[in-house]
Design a protein with these regions (language model features):
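Conserved signature/switch motifs of ABC ATPase nucleotide-binding domains
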Residues: 49, 70, 102
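ABC nucleotide-binding domain "signature" region
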Residues: 29-41
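Helix N-cap at the start of a conserved alpha-helix in ABC-type nucleotide-binding domains
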Residues: 86-88
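Short coil-to-helix segment of the ABC ATPase nucleotide-binding domain corresponding to the Q-loop/switch region
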Residues: 10-17
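Conserved ABC ATPase signature
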Residues: 50-54, 58-60
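Hydrophobic anchor residue at the start of the ABC signature
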Residues: 64
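Catalytic Walker B motif of ABC-type/P-loop ATPase nucleotide-binding domains
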Residues: 75-78
Length: 140
């Protein structure tokens, strides 16, 4: 999520719908799932806005909505809370935790050790590209 690759000429709704359109999902299902994803990240009231009209934090959450709308089995998030204020960061990590609880494997790369301690069930510490340690992981 460091670079969301949002489509600037499309609305928030259209940005989130894109993976479902590509997969051939029906229009009614697209509408239901896109609105649910936007609601989960607190952007339902911004569905008609283009990304340029959103704050950096809102753009970050829009990218997250697009990532979760297709209900992936595995979600890899690189600094997903980087542009968010602390309260929103907690909300996003809470969303990730709920996704994990219903079967989505989450891999979150972050420098925010507080979030790791609060939400991570397992962690791996990397230093200089090498595994340095972590819960349940042998140091390299």
């Amino acid at each position: 999520f460091q670079d969301n690759k949002l489509l600037g000429d499309r609305s928030a709704y259209e940005n989130v719908a894109l993976p479902l359109i590509i997969n051939g999902t029906g229009e009614r299902e697209i509408g239901r799932r896109v609105r649910a994803a936007l609601d989960q990240v607190g952007l339902l009231d911004r569905e008609r806005y283009p990304p340029r009209a959103l704050s950096a934090g809102e753009q970050q959450r829009l990218g997250i909505a697009r990532a979760i709308v297709s209900r992936p089995k595995v979600l890899i998030a690189d600094e997903p809370t980087g542009n968010l204020d602390p309260d929103l960061a907690l909300e996003v990590m809470g969303l990730f935790k709920r996704l994990n609880e219903v079967g989505t494997t989450m891999l979150v790369a972050t420098h925010d050790l507080h979030l790791v301690e609060r939400f991570g069930s397992r962690r791996i510490v990397l230093a200089g590209g090498q595994v340095e340690g972590g819960a349940g992981v042998q140091a390299a």
